[in-house]
Every structure is written in structure tokens, then in C-alpha cells.
Regions:
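Short, surface-exposed beta-strand/turn "edge" patches of beta-sheet domains
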Residues: 34-50, 153-157
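Conserved "repeat-terminator" motif of extracellular CCP/Sushi domains
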Residues: 23, 42-59
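Surface-exposed interfaces of beta-sheet-rich extracellular modules
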Residues: 16-43
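Short proline/glycine- and polar residue-rich coil/turn motifs
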Residues: 11-16, 46-49
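Short, recurring structural edge motifs at helix starts
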Residues: 5-10, 20-22, 59-72, 117-129
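Alpha-helical segments with a strong preference for the paired helices of cellulosomal dockerin domains
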Residues: 66-116, 126-177
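Short loop/beta submotifs within extracellular cysteine-rich repeat domains
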Residues: 4, 28-31, 39-41, 61, ...
Length: 177
């Protein structure tokens, strides 16, 4: 899964407090809490009855689960994403695209995760995952391209949900928190 929540202490003595922590799978980012907590942190105070909390997680394009220093690299994550969009699977998916500190190295696990992203990989929102457009947008964004340079000759056929650089950048930024 995307992660888990752990609260300490658990169970909570009546009238006491508990702090909940999200433990995130490395290809996800922490989201917000829901239920009896909201926002980025979860502290339950003066607990007098059962409480329910849910840790929410956000999928990312950090497909190898690498640390902050090597997260969202075009030569690793970007290359793997483009290859996946081209239909490459197995060892060829990750060949030459490894990075020290990657938490996910199994190509089958990466392909399964990318499959689970589904429509999130349709960067321009035209309904079809295409390495020549969506993959190019991912790679360019990871390389630092923004504005017109990001989208020049890189959008799929219409109708598209996202056609401007601002829309594409916002979509990709949400996948690379």
C-alpha cells in the first residue's frame, strides 16, 4: 500500500493524548489526515471515546523511491517512466537507470506502480498515455523546462484537458511534491 498510520500511545487512556505518525511507502508522499484529524499533523487531545483517523498519501513520479537528493531525476525516474509509456517491461525497464539509494529496484514493482497511476500519467489529459507527448512533458519538467519551452511540440491531439504550460506545470507539480 501507500503507507500506514501509527498512533502513540495506542490504546489511549481516557483523557490522555495521542500523536499519530504517517509511515510512507517511498514512492508516495504524505498527504493530509482525515477523520478526527485534519491537515498535515495528527494530535488527538483529551481522548474520551474511540476516534478514527486516516492517513492519506499522494502518488508521485519518484518511481524508484529514492531519497530527496535524487528524487525526480530525468535519467532515472524520467527514463523509467518514458520506457514504461513505450511498453518496455522487465529488466529493460530499469537498465542503466539505477541510482544509489533507490528503495525500489524491482522492474515488476515499478511497472505495477506506474500502471496504478493510470490517468495521472496522461499529462495533457487527452485520454491516452503517449511517450512522445506525456513522456516528453515528464522528462522536460524533470530537466527544469517551464513555460512555452515545456510544452512546445509536446502536446497530444485534442481534445485535451490541459493545453497550457500553467496547466501542465500544475499537474506535474502535484505528481512531484
Amino acid at each position: 500500500g501507500a503507507g500506514a498510520a501509527s498512533c502513540t500511545p495506542n490504546p489511549v487512556n481516557e483523557g490522555s493524548s495521542s500523536t499519530c505518525t504517517a509511515v510512507v511507502n517511498p514512492v508516495y508522499a504524505p498527504g493530509n489526515w482525515s477523520g478526527d484529524c485534519s491537515g498535515p499533523t495528527c494530535i488527538l487531545t483529551n481522548v474520551t471515546a474511540a476516534r478514527s483517523v486516516t492517513a492519506n498519501f499522494v502518488p508521485t513520479l519518484n518511481v524508484d523511491g529514492s531519497d530527496a537528493a535524487s528524487r525526480y531525476q530525468p535519467v532515472t525516474d524520467g527514463q523509467i517512466i518514458v520506457r514504461y509509456m513505450q511498453g518496455v517491461r522487465g529488466a529493460a525497464l530499469v537498465a542503466g537507470a539505477g541510482v544509489a539509494g533507490a528503495m525500489v529496484t524491482d522492474p515488476a514493482a515499478m511497472a505495477t506502480y506506474l500502471y496504478s497511476l493510470g490517468a495521472k500519467l496522461v499529462i495533457d489529459g487527452n485520454g491516452a498515455i503517449d511517450a512522445a507527448t506525456d513522456g516528453l512533458l515528464v522528462a522536460r519538467y524533470m530537466l527544469g523546462f517551464r513555460g512555452d519551452a515545456l510544452i512546445a511540440n509536446a502536446l497530444g491531439p485534442t481534445p485535451r484537458v490541459r493545453s497550457t504550460a500553467v496547466e501542465i506545470e500544475a499537474w506535474l507539480a502535484a505528481l512531484m511534491p
